[in-house]
Amino acid sequence: IHPKAEYHKRAYVTKKFVSDFNERTGNTVQYLEAPYEPNEYRKLVRGLEEEPEGGDRCKVCFDYRLDKTAQVAMDLGFDYFGSALTISPHKNSQTINSIGIDVQKIYTTHYLPSDFKKNQGYKRSVEMCEEYDIYRQCYCGCVYAAQAQNIDLVQVKKDATAFLLDKDVEKDYSHIKFTVTKLDI
């Protein structure tokens, strides 16, 4: 997600949502944050910068994200991994699911195919964003997609930085951070 301040803003908003959701529902959903590695992404998509939305650059991104998710899921002993990307009307669920199914072949965890936009899923996501006061971003996070959509990344950075000014991204909502407990059996 570019710029870095936008990454931190989205992470903070996600943690707030998880905390609020748990409080309202009595659930104990936890949050696990991926490291910020924009240079790794840029290396992977080098030569694909001009690809259109949904093109080969997106496929490389989906593969990278799903592979990282599967690695973590396997390391933590989860039976399944999945993606919320399929909620977006701008993302092809069949492509994402096909990549997820390919990725699962190299791990001991399974991909859970989804199409969250179906059955009014996208509409429900908009309703939940209003209900939980969730920030809805105007682009996926890809610097190249943002540029193609003429998104003012300087303004995005300013807005995200202003949002984060009075936030402690490390301590706020630390109670929902995923913790790993290894059992010796």
Per-range role (PLM):
Residues 1-185:
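Nucleotide-activated chemistry modules centered on ATP-dependent adenylation/adenylyltransferase
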